């Protein structure tokens, strides 16, 4: 078969796939007679009152010399760990902006970091395909090198995300470019379960993000370059419980809704979406006006009530605050005076929801506090 014939067959196959995708999209729209925004408007719900003075930048954390890729809060809300292209993990006191630890990593190409529930250890992973655990009680040498207390080896691709199981310092879940997620026993360093891989219900491309349910720690969501998100139960690793479609690009970030029965996603297609894990339905699409000008969604987080969705975007150095009920942007942090000078790569809310931290390719982190008399939403 000639090259021209192969190209022609490829073009025909691509057109067929696109047509089938359009048919699936139209069929889903027919099955769903409404979405959250239309239903809320019909019920007379009004837009949440939220303005530029309600979320203000109170601190800028400076110390990294490279792009910030990941961050995480401790459960007690006053410490943040960040991972950067400069090859260091920095633990910050969020109240004073002081650095309490600056850990030099064995591999500079770090992509993710996470605090243990007790706040005594941090985990990180990246292009070395290893998830490394550091004890914050260990003594660093003069170069800032802290001995690795545990190395979780087993992935055959980069480690894209790691998260401790809530209230369990001994268990952690990682996602990887090898198309799998792994549940680890941190105490022994051994795999407990592998999700995906040889199983047909697993992802068919790199897994980029995971989020564990706060209401049921046996459930977690994974997002992948195959444009899907999948629900898993750690008690039955052999197959995904449910697969969620809708995105037209890599699913870069996933986050459980506060009630534990819904979750949000952010994608390279520039949209955020809200799904219900019980019905498998897509509830809402959050898409900014002006197709594609904001670029991919890099990171998301929900307020403690779920009424607000914070979404970072790769373009325009912006973070939108969405009203999840009405599907409207109520605040653009990119327009604030103290906004980032480069793309927002990661963000997260403190445990009590009183502060938002954003990390950026401008090497800085910023802490945004709910200003004035406003209560946490």
From Swiss-Prot:
SMART domains: WD40. GO terms for molecular function: GTPase activity. Keywords: Abscisic acid signaling pathway, Cell membrane, Cytoplasm, Membrane, Nucleus, Plant defense, Repeat, Transducer, WD repeat. Its main location: membrane. Coiled coil: none annotated. One of its GO terms (cellular component) is cytoplasm. WD repeats lie at residues 63-93, 105-135, 154-185, 202-233, 246-276, 292-323, 339-369. Disruption phenotype: Shorter hypocotyls and abnormal roots architecture; more auxin-induced lateral roots. Enhanced susceptibility to necrotrophic and vascular pathogenic fungi, such as Alternaria brassicicola, Plectosphaerella cucumerina and Fusarium oxysporum associated with a disturbed expression of genes involved in cell wall metabolism. Longer and wider primary roots with faster growth. Severely compromised root waving and abnormal root skewing response. Hypersensitivity to ethylene (ACC). Belongs to the WD repeat G protein beta family. Guanine nucleotide-binding proteins (G proteins) are involved as a modulator or transducer in various transmembrane signaling systems. The beta and gamma chains are required for the GTPase activity, for replacement of GDP by GTP, and for G protein-effector interaction. The heterotrimeric G-protein controls defense responses to necrotrophic and vascular fungi probably by modulating cell wall-related genes expression (e.g. lower xylose content in cell walls); involved in resistance to fungal pathogens such as Alternaria brassicicola and Fusarium oxysporum. Modulates root architecture (e.g. The DWD box is required for interaction with DDB1A. This is Guanine nucleotide-binding protein subunit beta. It comes from Arabidopsis thaliana (Mouse-ear cress). The lineage of its organism: Eukaryota, Viridiplantae, Streptophyta, Embryophyta, Tracheophyta. The gene is GB1.
